Amino acid sequence: MSITKDQILEAVAAMSVMDVVELVSAMEEKFGVSAAAAVAVAAGPAEVAEEKTEFDVVLKGIGANKVAVIKAVRGATGLGLKEAKDLVESAPAVLKEGVSKDDAEALKKSLEEAGAEVEVK
């Protein structure tokens, strides 16, 4: 009678950490492989899955209430009236770069309430 994978997993789960280390060493010797290579390969794709920490807020469109959007942009960016108006009229335009997710979402919400179309990248 052969042992199933489930039985092997249950046996390994019941072992102490030292027993598992000894088992891995014995398997490395028996099969001529290294467990470190498998760990390095498995760790590679995990870096790609990192969560983004900095976001850009992009004004995609003005909407119907241009004045309210200009006021919201002025409040968020600290620009003067002329600069904020030029920025709004040049949509699509990046309003803020490298901001946190919370700040980006708050800015997006305030601009959307003013009638703008906003994207967080």
UniProtKB/Swiss-Prot annotation:
It comes from the Bacteria. Keywords: Ribonucleoprotein, Ribosomal protein. One of its GO terms (cellular component) is cytosolic large ribosomal subunit. InterPro entries: Ribosomal_bL12 (IPR000206), Ribosomal_bL12_C (IPR013823), Ribosomal_bL12_C/ClpS-like (IPR014719), Ribosomal_bL12_oligo (IPR008932), Ribosomal_bL12_oligo_N_sf (IPR036235). PANTHER family: 39S RIBOSOMAL PROTEIN L12, LARGE RIBOSOMAL SUBUNIT PROTEIN BL12M. Forms part of the ribosomal stalk which helps the ribosome interact with GTP-bound translation factors. Is thus essential for accurate translation. This is Large ribosomal subunit protein bL12. The lineage of its organism: Bacteria, Pseudomonadati, Pseudomonadota, Gammaproteobacteria, Enterobacterales. The gene is rplL.
